[in-house]
Amino acid sequence: MAHEILDGSSMQRALTRITYEIIEQNKGVDNLVFVGIKTRGVYLAKRLAKRLNQLENVEIPVAPLDVSLYRDDRHVPDHTQEPTVKTDQLDIDITNKHVILVDDVLFTGRTVRAALDALMDMGRPTRISLAVLVDRGHRELPIRPDFVGKNIPTAMNETVHVAVEEYDGHEDVTIEHN
């Protein structure tokens, strides 16, 4: 049975806090680009951009990023054949930009590592920062978020699920013991 950790209002407050932190830690927001990791990271990135627009009256580009080709745990039947890299995946130029990579949950760090590999194939940003709604710990790689909505310590046998209205039809963050 899932236990609710954050409701929709708490999620919005966490995203607003992240937005303020982004403004405070950057000298201006003109060079920012949000890249959301599919699926729910894209919706969170769009919300951050919208909130930033409300606060600073500036349009920040948002692009979705599919990291499935870059995962180190995906099955490749023919190990001699490298996956085809879609360098035109982003519809915005990230070269010389400050990219804020957005994801819903940070766990082992493997998804973020895959996203970093993908981004480096698509351009050369001046800086990459990581914003996550939930950091649940248990890192397997030396990856640390720059902006965190909520730290939620978990056990390895628990699952954290983020639901967003745009995709799931409701909003909350739940934790489930498997």
UniProtKB/Swiss-Prot annotation:
It comes from the Bacteria. GO terms for biological process: DNA-templated transcription termination. GO terms for molecular function: RNA binding; uracil phosphoribosyltransferase activity. Its EC number is 2.4.2.9. Disulfide bonds: none annotated. SUPFAM superfamilies: PRTase-like. A motif (PRPP-binding) lies at residues 99-111. InterPro entries: PRibTrfase_dom (IPR000836), PRTase-like (IPR029057), PyrR (IPR023050), PyrR_bifunctional (IPR050137). Pfam families: Pribosyltran (PF00156). Keywords: Glycosyltransferase, RNA-binding, Transcription, Transcription regulation, Transcription termination, Transferase. It catalyses: UMP + diphosphate = 5-phospho-alpha-D-ribose 1-diphosphate + uracil. Homodimer and homohexamer; in equilibrium. Regulates transcriptional attenuation of the pyrimidine nucleotide (pyr) operon by binding in a uridine-dependent manner to specific sites on pyr mRNA. This disrupts an antiterminator hairpin in the RNA and favors formation of a downstream transcription terminator, leading to a reduced expression of downstream genes. Belongs to the purine/pyrimidine phosphoribosyltransferase family. PyrR subfamily. This is Bifunctional protein PyrR. It comes from Limosilactobacillus reuteri subsp. reuteri (strain JCM 1112).
